[in-house]
Amino acid sequence: MNCEKFTRNQSGNILVHCDRSDPNRTYKNQEIDHSKTYLNYNLAPEHTGMTDYEFMKKRCEEFKVLKRKDVNWLVSWVITMPTDYKGNKALFFREAYNFMANRYGKGNVVSAYVHLDETSPHMHFCFVPVIFDKKKQEYKVNAKQCINKVELKQIHPEMQEYLENKLQTKVNILNGATAEGNKTVEQLKNEEKIKEKAIVELIQNPTEEIKKSVIEQIPVEQKENIIEAVSYTHLTLP
């Protein structure tokens, strides 16, 4: 999981990236397999007569929001399905959506697109960060207070517990990336590429020299997953 915040001007681009509605648009992410884009779907309710951006704007205007250009109007959590999860994919994302919608308010959800046209299945859960100001007794839009250090620390274990109870199976939301904090999508993709390269080399060249060379390049938190992936080759990794 990783979290990003967007100003009003930045929100349009991420919302367009999520819905993939324009077939002629060139997306920055080169890993999109457009032949699979039709498999993507949105778990959030439709905003009748409004685009996602228009709904976000309307929701923000319903509450107190600072007019400064640097104020964040939108928050996006990217929830990636764990590689070792073997259960029902649709159910995983449905329950992940339910957890997030209940946490941040169903009325604040802008979109929740599940992307199946990229390397790893994931959901972009986008919402307006509305909080209740106890001192002033009013609701307001404030991403900094909504996604603070306490929230970043608590959400991962709480989501894992919720999903495991609902899905009745182990769900590794708490992984190396979580332990180090919320990483960017680019960082997560780079780590995934390192893992894939290591697995290929170990399978194709299962010699002691290759094993030692490859293992030295693998981040500590990824070794366990790689060991599981190549276990059928009978390799012994340190």
In which residue ranges do the predicted regions lie?
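N-terminal nicking endonuclease/strand-transfer module with a His-rich metal-binding environment
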Residues: 1-235
